[in-house]
């Protein structure tokens, strides 16, 4: 019987809990509902709890309250993805409940599990049952009930695990998509692994590592290194050019399609947004003067910007020769207002930068940046205001969490995809207040539909679509709408579901594995099937996704 848990014993529980999750991270990844090659739940939870474990191992204490503060801080700063943030919040509440204690008894152990659940539910904007939250809630309730019958912490932990497993097995009955795919909730499974490890540590057992101990620094740097090997002379259009034109009554009448067609002859990476009075343009060109002259045919030039991208690239290379990592350069750049974009792929990162993003944090579907990654960039920028573009639904919670931990006034634009991030950033006005930019950038998301093409990593059936491993999949927002072993059939099937008579602009962002012949064929198909839709092409260089699309 174990009636008390002190700091040393709690440290053993944490270490074994982290080890058990690490050993089972691949299993947890495999339970992801959608068969996209992200596998992020197990990875994110593993990185999160490993961050907490490392803090504990470096700051051991006999006091469980002090150790809990250390563990909570490590989890909070290391949290990655929604599952990692929820895990950090569960133990934030747990540790807050014991912060003044040197040791705890069975009843306090149980009440701490419940305190963690209360904290996590408050942290999630729209809690969904059938997830890690449900498993945590049912396990905590079981712990409280068992602690009324016994003073043995081991018995409480055993009962907590048993009920957590029952709850996990019931998740398909609460969440239809789990039942359709035939899996239990991945986050709930990850939490069960942690609790099972807790019991091993509590009873003095050691879980052997199945693989080398995770080195978070090496993994993060390896996954986050997005800087390409492009040569300066390979930059075809060297001037990032932007202008804002106020239409004049005595000037040329504005027709958007004609304007786009004419502007596209000046270069690439063209973006055009207009309302009744103003048109805003972004283009990479060799002749910025000609762009401005053309703009003057329509009215008065309000704002102009030209940046020499070749010179910028030479400066990056110069700094790299001084052994400055690209991420470190981004972090150390100081600005009044930091615009932080989470990005994947050289082309996409360059596009965000050319549009006004001051800092790029590499990351995306396969590697979500941690709360600490985002906090570091904001703090080291020494900004007064910050705008975060997560550009992925799984990075939203860590972005929100980071916003609460910094002194700068910080807002998070709820961008769930790269195309939505681009649309939001295009609405940024440096002369407007943070509140106005937040409003305008968020509103811009309503007019953009996002799509993507990737490949399936397993056989499954979801959203009524039969999917075979290795097939291409077309996703509209996060819903799978088509799957086929023919890439072109998949892409056109997706676009048919996204385009309609109201569609005006289709933006195609080609990934690092995109096929040039298919890309050319795709543009021809769109121009034939949807002649009124203007097509814009960008080389994003993103991994995982052959294509990203936006429809406006």
Curated annotation (Swiss-Prot):
InterPro entries, alphabetized: DegV_domain_contain, DhaL_dom, DhaL_dom_sf, FakA-like_C, FakA-like_M, YloV-like
Entry-linked PROSITE patterns: DHAL
Domain DhaL: 8-200
A Pfam short name: FakA-like_M
GO biological process: glycerol metabolic process
Highest taxon of source: Bacteria
Molecular function terms from GO: glycerone kinase activity
Stated name of the protein: Uncharacterized protein SH1689
